[in-house]
Amino acid sequence: NSNFWQNRLEINRIFLLQNKRWILGSVFLAIILLLPIFILFGELFSVQESSFFYLWDNLLIDYTFNTFYLLILTSFFSLLFGILPAWLITNYKFKGRNILDVILYLPLAIPTYIMAFTYSDMLSYTGPIQSFFRNNFVEFSTIFNRDYLQIEFLGLLMALSLYPYIYTSSRVSFSLLGSNYMDLSKNLGVSKFKSFFKILIPLSRPAIFSGLFLVLMEVLNEYGAVKYFGVNTYTTGIFRSWFSMGDIGTAIQL
């Protein structure tokens, strides 16, 4: 009995030592990751109040509205472009399905600002699309003759670039959940349309929202595309305050 308890105490001591090492390592890693945030919060309370009131009166409302409007637009189109193709690829078999599945991932390989520049140039007045319609179908040329450097078009382009985040998570979730629950609902006489919205979508919410979260983070940190479109967001405001105006305090507040 004495040997048993001695061995038990020794084992507990070893596990306790290992747990302490893991805890200390986790705390050290967390401090390293959170250190920039702590520094920003520390600097936030040391900036001049005049810059804060200038920011509030002249810039903050515009930055806030544009940022949230762009988030809403991109989220809506990303969910649309991500969930529906994932559903079709998962539940239907057709020719070229595997090739289409690979193609739907490719927008992640293209930077958002390059996609925004390319599409806006193609659709511009001197671009190939409007030039083609002016030369061949004059009556339809006015349909495309518009200013595309607008926040609505930017939200659509960013969704075309970022929807694979939602497509990937939705595709995996539909593959794992789809067959079992869809077969059960089919046996109960429920249509595929109702099963999709009432069963599969609610069960796949965690996966969908995880992809949507990544989309939102990408929209918030995007600079090149919003700068090219001339849309004032928090990111462009930070760059303008820090590098153009040399006002680090206002950049930190943003």
What are the residue ranges of the model-derived segments?
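Membrane-water interface segments at the C-terminal ends of transmembrane alpha-helices
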Residues: 17-47, 58-174, 203-223, 251-253
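Interhelical loop and adjacent transmembrane-helix boundary motif
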Residues: 223-254
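Helix-loop-helix "hairpin" substructures at the membrane interface of multi-pass membrane proteins
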Residues: 194-195
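Short, Lys/Arg-rich, polar N-terminal cytosolic tail immediately upstream
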Residues: 1-16
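Glycine/proline-centered hinge or cleavage motifs at structural transition points of membrane proteins
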Residues: 188-190, 202
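Short coil/turn motifs that cap or connect alpha-helices
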Residues: 95, 190-191
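A short amphipathic helical element positioned immediately N-terminal to and/or at the very start
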Residues: 8, 12, 50-56
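Short amphipathic alpha-helical coupling elements at transmembrane boundaries
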Residues: 50-54, 101, 134-138, 179-187, ...
